[in-house]
């Protein structure tokens, strides 16, 4: 039996909005598998669509560069927001981004090796760990970029107007689509969601045959919600992003979205523990 920790229960609560006891029970039944627990809670009606995993905890910056025919996003992390605004940290981060743009296709390992000496020197000077974490390239005829406070970076590739593609990049930053078009949603993802929806309908008392027919309409809605062109456009929710693109004679071939600290869990300490740490245990 897997250990059901308080942090695991908290994560399930954050992602489902369900009560503490329901979350703990679901985790016990799923032997600590949080994704299975979410699926089971959705099937039983205890939770609706759960939030995606990927709690943002680490600090740092996302930087973007757009060259002729491609763009690049670079993420550099540090431990505190204070250091994320430090001139030395930002200077190194910009050097990294410039190098990545000038040397298209550089891997994250090569990028880390290239700047290891400077990174180590800055760590020694500032006294805080930092890391070049991710680099992502995107090719395209037209590339638009959008940075939201250096915490979220988006590149959108397509054809048509760069100005209109920038509006789409802003939408991607806000709405977090996972695919470009509804038809791009993988068969595995569709089947997984379809089975959950069937089980929800059956658990509500519907016969299996009726449940399967009901689900077809729900699946069309689902693929639209997770795809860029199927989502309601944030600047005009009365139209989809796809409809907006058609109206301005512009198309999207691909996009990349990075957010500082995605998937990194920062250790949390309560106030008493933090004071004790600072005072050497004499809280």
UniProtKB/Swiss-Prot annotation:
Keywords: Cytoplasm, Elongation factor, Protein biosynthesis. One of its GO terms (molecular function) is translation elongation factor activity. Residues 80-83 are annotated as: Involved in Mg(2+) ion dislocation from EF-Tu. PROSITE patterns: EF_TS_1 (PS01126), EF_TS_2 (PS01127). It comes from the Bacteria. InterPro entries: EF-Ts_dimer_sf (IPR036402), Transl_elong_EFTs/EF1B (IPR001816), Transl_elong_EFTs/EF1B_dimer (IPR014039), Transl_elong_Ts_CS (IPR018101), UBA-like_sf (IPR009060). Signal peptide: none annotated. SUPFAM superfamilies: Elongation factor Ts (EF-Ts), dimerisation domain, UBA-like. Associates with the EF-Tu.GDP complex and induces the exchange of GDP to GTP. It remains bound to the aminoacyl-tRNA.EF-Tu.GTP complex up to the GTP hydrolysis stage on the ribosome. This is Elongation factor Ts. It comes from Haemophilus influenzae (strain 86-028NP).
